[in-house]
């Protein structure tokens, strides 16, 4: 069944803009869950630009749905994940100069290293998802390294400049989902999804979870977080 993972990074972005204590992502996670979020997602970046170590540790204690920790495949982040033990980890690419994650992880180009990281995490009981572009080579590599999930990068779909191009990108996502399922992978998706473009992605066969942050938090500024989460669930066709 399709579910909604709410990414609360930008609650922390607002807090860090003033280097203060509010708004608190931990409190936001509680509100999101009460409004119907099926999971909470946070990205602990190496530069700590928004989510902080404190947030991850407190969220592990307070989240009642599931906690998805997005992180780079570095020794530091693996050590934190092994300590905190989120419900699952999503490995993502990371560059300090980027505003947000700009593309999928190049799994095919680092199979040996990622196999080791995935094995270390999953050997400790932490399932691993890989954030990848909807590319056949990357999907095959994700299966090769032993990941449980792939999260398909929906950025090109979200940024398509015409209906025709959007349909092309949607077709790529559908084919990628089908390939992943055939290889025994579970399928999530995210990046750039909004209230206005989420519907077709939500209807892709086999899709398990959509991770959405910026659109929900942007709307929450105007209507409140509870309503913003509920409206996203409606846009996804969830009750």
From Swiss-Prot:
Biological role: Catalyzes the complicated ring closure reaction between the two acyclic compounds 1-deoxy-D-xylulose-5-phosphate (DXP) and 3-amino-2-oxopropyl phosphate (1-amino-acetone-3-phosphate or AAP) to form pyridoxine 5'-phosphate (PNP) and inorganic phosphate.
Principal subcellular localization: cytoplasm
Subunit and interaction comment: Homooctamer; tetramer of dimers.
UniProt xrefs under InterPro entries: Aldolase_TIM, PyrdxlP_synth_PdxJ, Pyridoxine-5'_phos_synth
Chain positions recorded as 1-deoxy-D-xylulose 5-phosphate binding sites: 9-10, 45, 50, 100
Active site positions: 43 (proton acceptor), 70 (proton acceptor), 191 (proton donor)
PANTHER family registered for this protein in UniProt: PYRIDOXINE 5'-PHOSPHATE SYNTHASE
Family indicated by similarity: Belongs to the PNP synthase family.
This protein's UniProt keywords: Cytoplasm, Pyridoxine biosynthesis, Transferase
HAMAP family to which the protein is assigned, alphabetical: PdxJ
NCBIfam families: pdxJ, PRK05265.1-1, PRK05265.1-3, PRK05265.1-5
Subcellular location: Cytoplasm
Superkingdom, taxonomy of origin: Bacteria
Gene3D superfamilies listed in its UniProt record: Aldolase class I
Protein's recorded name: Pyridoxine 5'-phosphate synthase
GO biological process, one term: pyridoxine biosynthetic process
């Amino acid at each position: 069944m399709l579910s909604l993972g709410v990414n609360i990074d930008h609650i922390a972005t607002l807090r860090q803009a003033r280097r203060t204590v509010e708004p608190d992502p931990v409190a936001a996670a509680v509100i999101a869950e009460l409004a119907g979020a099926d999971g909470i997602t946070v990205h602990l970046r190496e530069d700590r630009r928004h989510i902080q170590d404190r947030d991850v540790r407190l969220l592990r204690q307070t989240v009642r749905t599931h906690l998805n920790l997005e992180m780079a495949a570095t020794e530091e982040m693996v050590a934190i994940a092994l300590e905190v033990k989120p419900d699952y980890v999503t490995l993502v690419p990371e560059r300090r100069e980027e505003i947000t994650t700009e593309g999928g992880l190049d799994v095919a180009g680092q199979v040996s290293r990622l196999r080791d990281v995935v094995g270390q995490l999953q050997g400790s009981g932490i399932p691993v998802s890989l954030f990848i572009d909807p590319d056949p080579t990357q999907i095959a590599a994700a299966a090769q390294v032993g990941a449980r999930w792939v999260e398909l990068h929906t950025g090109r779909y979200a940024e398509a400049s015409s209906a025709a191009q959007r349909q092309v990108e949607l077709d790529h996502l559908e084919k990628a989902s089908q390939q992943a399922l055939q290889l025994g992978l579970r399928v999530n998706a995210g990046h750039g999804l909004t209230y206005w473009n989420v519907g077709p992605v939500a209807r892709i066969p086999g899709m398990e979870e959509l991770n959405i942050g910026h659109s929900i938090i942007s709307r929450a500024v105007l209507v409140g977080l509870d309503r913003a989460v509920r409206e996203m669930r409606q846009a996804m066709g969830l009750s």
